[in-house]
Amino acid sequence: MKIVIQRVKRAQVSIDQQLRSSIGQGLLLLVGVGPDDSQEDMDYAVRKIVNMRIFSDAEGKMNLSIKDIDGEILSISQFTLHADTKKGNRPAFVKAAPPEMASNFYDAFNLALQQEVPTRTGIFGADMQVELVNDGPVTIILDTKNR
């Protein structure tokens, strides 16, 4: 799994100019599923995301997790995180999981997140418009294959 984690003041996703989901303070996740991602990868990602201390405490130090601040998550599927850009100028996406596998994995990932933190989503495979107000900005890239 490759996940871009962004700390946000607020975020929302629309599809066909209709608001699908929105959150207040929390995390926007851009989630890419690879063909060899496993339950172990999912468990690792969920554990890292919900416990990562990237929110400021009273002294302004990044010392609080999303759980500590009662924040929310907006999770957006993004297969383009697995783009292969080595050859030519057009990215190839052969390193992304096949759509059916990725969709099921993404749904299970979101259910696991929901057990820990209120989680909203876009729609897998849809053309989405994502709006966010970055906080910091704080942006972290999590790759479950690099641990």
UniProtKB/Swiss-Prot annotation:
It is an enzyme of class 3 (hydrolase). Gene3D superfamilies: D-tyrosyl-tRNA(Tyr) deacylase. It holds the Pfam family Tyr_Deacylase. The keyword rRNA-binding does not apply. Its EC number is 3.1.1.96. A motif (Gly-cisPro motif, important for rejection of L-amino acids) lies at residues 136-137. One of its GO terms (cellular component) is cytoplasm. Keywords: Cytoplasm, Hydrolase, RNA-binding, tRNA-binding. It is found in: Cytoplasm. GO terms for biological process: D-amino acid catabolic process. The keyword Cell membrane does not apply. GO terms for molecular function: D-tyrosyl-tRNA(Tyr) deacylase activity; Gly-tRNA(Ala) deacylase activity; Ser(Gly)-tRNA(Ala) hydrolase activity; tRNA binding. It catalyses: glycyl-tRNA(Ala) + H2O = tRNA(Ala) + glycine + H(+); a D-aminoacyl-tRNA + H2O = a tRNA + a D-alpha-amino acid + H(+). PANTHER family: D-AMINOACYL-TRNA DEACYLASE 1, D-TYROSYL-TRNA TYR DEACYLASE. A Gly-cisPro motif from one monomer fits into the active site of the other monomer to allow specific chiral rejection of L-amino acids. Homodimer. An aminoacyl-tRNA editing enzyme that deacylates mischarged D-aminoacyl-tRNAs. Also deacylates mischarged glycyl-tRNA(Ala), protecting cells against glycine mischarging by AlaRS. Acts via tRNA-based rather than protein-based catalysis; rejects L-amino acids rather than detecting D-amino acids in the active site. By recycling D-aminoacyl-tRNA to D-amino acids and free tRNA molecules, this enzyme counteracts the toxicity associated with the formation of D-aminoacyl-tRNA entities in vivo and helps enforce protein L-homochirality. Belongs to the DTD family. This is D-aminoacyl-tRNA deacylase. It comes from Streptococcus sanguinis (strain SK36). The gene is dtd.
